[in-house]
Amino acid sequence: MTAERIALISDCEGNVAALQAALRAIKRLAPDSIVVAGDILASPFSPDPPSETIALLRSEPVQAIPGNTDRCLLDWGTPRWPHTLWMRLRRSDPAGSWLDDMAGGQALIAPADLAWLRSLAEEFLVTEGVWVCHGMPGNPWNSIWPRSPIYDANVSAADRDASLRMLANVDATLVLCGHISSPPEYHDQLPDGRDLHVVRADARDAESVGYAVLTRRSDTWHTDWHSARIVARA
């Protein structure tokens, strides 16, 4: 039986060179699916023109979702904005002054590109049992972190339990996500007793961009993390 492979990228945040580097390296591996788990753009302003990031994604065989930074840009000025703002303000860390610049950031995104971003699924099953989200299932603003004081400041027990119940409902036992890069993976348990495996894309810095490649053999997923060197744009 042929092994199934999924490549995972996340949080390039409008850095075209980083996205290019990850996609170039991934395509050499010829996975069955390439997933971009959100934060396609930075909010409110990306380092490169948003049109270049969107054009690159639209030219490649990728399945992408919006992250929390994208949600701000997509929802500003729409009936959805109050809910998006409420989701952000629920976090314990201050929101900062980015609200003042959101209209200007959205204005830099072409209407056709905004429409494409808004057409993306917020979360989805990429293959049987594998759920793609940005942070935690149902909430791109937080992460489905392990139960630890270090990670739990923004996540209540009710939030976590709701995410785990949702995953059980859609029969997902593997979650691919981004938002943060550490820990790169951990294991939990669904309410019905099944094991849950959470995998994140690796970190990005000024010199390299991380990505994960998951391979299913005999109904078990194995993860390898890689990094690709970012080539500065001329």
Predicted regions and their residues:
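Binuclear metal-dependent phosphoesterase catalytic core
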Residues: 187-234
